[in-house]
């Protein structure tokens, strides 16, 4: 929970796009940890799904930073602004990835966080509410980033000269966008790949918990 809240607040203060995305990655891994330690089916499934989803989304966002860095050699947010007016294809894909990162329904970023929170609410209302606040912070820094970079005011004259994404960049980014949207709308194939393993893990945990309780209670009964 501390990792989620703290790194989300740090991300809000970043002026460097790459650092902002890096801190957001730490926050998202906080949800993975939270889901695992709920020891619930929903929480653990959400953690696994979140790891896979975040791998796609973070890779896409880092690639997006690399694309504009290759053109203007700057990762600073204030270097950019109004990119939608000059490189619309890039801007459209960046928007998809940013919305996925904040957990918009219909993207792979939604289901993982939803399942983790569902598992957390079963165990601790306070922890779940704090994690939900982290989701709000995540939406804040991703929307803040998108507003300034994609829809902000263009103060740098060099932006007007840059080229939109080339064919190889289109292939990479569109492929990532496809899987992010596909697993957002149709998560079942991915969920089925680890459903058996999660059920087995939960079963083993519950068995171990029962056995430990039996061992604890036996000395008490013998002493009586």
List PLM regions with ranges.
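Acidic-residue sensor for enzyme active/binding pockets
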Residues: 113, 169, 218
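A very general structural signal that marks isolated residues within well-ordered alpha-helical segments
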Residues: 32, 86, 152, 221-222
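Residue-level detector of conserved catalytic or cofactor/ligand-binding positions
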Residues: 214-224
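Hydrophobic transmembrane alpha-helices and their helix-loop junctions in integral membrane proteins
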Residues: 1-147
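Cytoplasmic/organellar membrane-interface segments at the starts of transmembrane helices
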Residues: 87-89, 142-213
């Amino acid at each position: 929970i501390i990792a989620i809240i703290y790194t989300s607040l740090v991300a809000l203060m970043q002026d460097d796009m790459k650092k902002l995305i890096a801190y957001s990655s730490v926050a998202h891994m906080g949800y993975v940890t939270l889901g695992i330690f709920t020891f619930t089916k929903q929480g653990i499934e959400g953690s696994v799904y979140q790891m896979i989803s975040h791998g796609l989304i973070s890779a896409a966002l880092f690639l997006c930073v690399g694309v504009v860095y290759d053109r203007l050699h700057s990762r600073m947010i204030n270097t950019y602004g109004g990119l939608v007016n000059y490189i619309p294809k890039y801007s459209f894909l960046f928007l998809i990835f940013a919305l996925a990162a904040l957990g918009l329904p219909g993207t792979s970023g939604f289901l993982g966080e939803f399942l983790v929170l569902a598992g957390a609410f079963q165990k601790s209302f306070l922890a779940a509410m704090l994690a939900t606040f982290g989701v709000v912070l995540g939406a804040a820094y991703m929307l803040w980033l998108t507003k300034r970079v994609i829809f902000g005011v263009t103060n740098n004259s060099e932006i007007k000269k840059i080229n939109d994404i080339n064919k190889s960049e289109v292939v990479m980014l569109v492929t990532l966008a496809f899987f992010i949207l596909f697993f957002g709308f149709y998560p079942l194939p991915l969920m089925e790949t680890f459903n058996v393993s999660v059920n087995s893990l939960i079963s083993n945990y519950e068995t171990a918990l029962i056995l430990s309780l039996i061992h604890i209670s036996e000395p008490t009964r013998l002493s009586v």
